[in-house]
């Protein structure tokens, strides 16, 4: 995943991720959105219901988009994907296109580390600022 620094409250409306190739006969990813503190020690989930992406085998690139509606308070947030389930043979592979942008992994102990020295998994998030205007 990656961190967002928001100057205003925001509403996230769409999440998209590309998969370059999947050999697994079933792979399930989960979209995650957390509010976090500046030190990235505390993560509070913002999605009320889980959003899953089912990836079926294909040697061709695929793009998966999901409509979402998530209110994110101003400050720091973390958006990413988690692997939920992978079914296949021992030699099956799952490929994302990569970027040179930093991508972070959140481990079960809560620690955050960059993935492979500036190797990232690209995804996109659409949304808009949520500003209340007094009349």
Q: Over which residues does each language-model region extend?
A:
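Exposed aromatic-hydrophobic patches
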Residues: 60-70
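Beta-sheet-rich sandwich/jelly-roll-like modules and their strand-loop junctions
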Residues: 1-37, 76, 82-135
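Outer-membrane beta-barrel proteins
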Residues: 19-21, 54, 69
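Short, surface-exposed linear segments at secondary-structure transitions and domain or protein termini
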Residues: 54-62, 103-107
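Residue-level detector of beta-propeller blades
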Residues: 41, 45-46, 114
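Solvent-exposed serine/threonine-rich low-complexity stretches and specific carbohydrate-binding patches
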Residues: 44-57
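Eukaryote-biased detector of low-complexity, proline/serine/threonine-rich segments
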Residues: 70-76
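Well-ordered beta-strand positions in beta-sheet-rich domains
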Residues: 1-3, 50, 63-65
């Amino acid at each position: 995943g990656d961190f967002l620094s928001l100057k205003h409250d925001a509403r996230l409306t769409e999440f998209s991720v590309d998969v370059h190739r999947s050999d697994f006969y079933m792979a399930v990813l989960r979209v995650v959105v957390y509010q976090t503190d500046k030190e990235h020690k505390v993560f509070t989930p913002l999605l009320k219901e889980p959003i899953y992406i089912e990836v079926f085998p294909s040697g061709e690139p695929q793009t998966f988009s999901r409509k979402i509606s998530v209110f994110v308070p101003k400050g720091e947030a973390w958006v990413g994907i988690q692997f939920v389930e992978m079914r296949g043979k021992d030699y099956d592979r799952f490929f994302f296109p990569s970027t040179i942008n930093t991508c972070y992994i959140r481990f079960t102990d809560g620690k955050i580390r960059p993935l492979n020295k500036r190797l990232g998994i690209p995804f996109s998030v659409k949304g808009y600022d949520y500003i209340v205007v007094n009349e």
